Curated annotation (Swiss-Prot):
This is DNA-directed RNA polymerase subunit omega. It comes from the Bacteria. It comes from Lactobacillus gasseri (strain ATCC 33323 / DSM 20243 / BCRC 14619 / CIP 102991 / JCM 1131 / KCTC 3163 / NCIMB 11718 / NCTC 13722 / AM63). Keywords: DNA-directed RNA polymerase, Nucleotidyltransferase, Transcription, Transferase. Its EC number is 2.7.7.6. The gene is rpoZ. Belongs to the RNA polymerase subunit omega family. It catalyses: RNA(n) + a ribonucleoside 5'-triphosphate = RNA(n+1) + diphosphate. One of its GO terms (biological process) is DNA-templated transcription. Signal peptide: none annotated. The keyword Transferase applies. NCBIfam families: rpoZ (TIGR00690). The keyword Ribonucleoprotein does not apply. GO terms for cellular component: DNA-directed RNA polymerase complex. InterPro entries: DNA-dir_RNA_pol_omega, Pol_omega/Rpo6/RPB6, RPB6/omega-like_sf.
Amino acid sequence: MKITYPSIDKLLSRVNSRYSLSVLAAKRAHEIQAGAPLALKHYKSDKAVGKALEEIAAGKVTIDPEHREDIG
């Protein structure tokens, strides 16, 4: 699968590693699938992972420094 939007460069500017990005996106996607409120009004993606990546790119979802050990 190739990610074209949001760009990987924009996503990596929000987190410090690809590993942290993948864990953060997966956790947020699970929250979205479980019915958590969405952080944006409009999404390009229909899938939870795509929505999570869009939220990360927009700066709406970040890693909490106090719980950083949960991410890696």
